[in-house]
Amino acid sequence: MKVDMSTSVKDDAQLEASRVRENPPPMYKVLLLNDDFTPMDFVVQVLQQFFHMNREKATHIMLQVHTQGHGVCGVYTKDVAATKVEQVLQYAKAHQHPLQCVMEEN
């Protein structure tokens, strides 16, 4: 008796693909938090360097951080968000600024 495994593998792949479409990975917001010490220009620089924003958008987000206490830098998968947070925190610390960056589920 001959079994056609290619159909079974194909069906499994289609089933897995449909599961992925039904359940996308959870997304996380990366936020910068306001403080009274980090210069506004440094925040703009961080947004441009780590979140690839143009100066206008980075300035807009920086003003949100300044006036509202926090600003959303972007929305990413968990691993990417965690990496961005760590990069920003290390960069701020290296430049002796207390800038805080956190992530929260979207």
Curated annotation (Swiss-Prot):
Gene Ontology biological process terms from the UniProt entry: protein catabolic process; proteolysis
Give the residue ranges for region: Disordered.
Answer: 1-20
Disulfide bond positions: none
Coiled-coil features, chain-numbered ranges: none
Q: Which SUPFAM superfamilies match?
A: ClpS-like
What the entry lists under Gene3D superfamilies is as follows: 3.30.1390.10
Q: Mind telling me which Pfam families this protein's record contains? A: ClpS
Quaternary structure, from the entry:
Binds to the N-terminal domain of the chaperone ClpA.
- Identify the NCBIfam families for this entry: PRK00033.1-2, PRK00033.1-5
Similarity comment: family membership: Belongs to the ClpS family.
- Function in brief: Involved in the modulation of the specificity of the ClpAP-mediated ATP-dependent protein degradation.
Per its UniProt record, what PANTHER family does this chain match? ATP-DEPENDENT CLP PROTEASE ADAPTER PROTEIN CLPS, ATP-DEPENDENT CLP PROTEASE ADAPTER PROTEIN CLPS1, CHLOROPLASTIC
Q: What is this protein called?
A: ATP-dependent Clp protease adapter protein ClpS
Q: What organism is listed for this UniProt entry?
A: Chromobacterium violaceum (strain ATCC 12472 / DSM 30191 / JCM 1249 / CCUG 213 / NBRC 12614 / NCIMB 9131 / NCTC 9757 / MK)
Organism ancestry: Bacteria, Pseudomonadati, Pseudomonadota, Betaproteobacteria, Neisseriales
Instruction: Name the gene.
Output: clpS
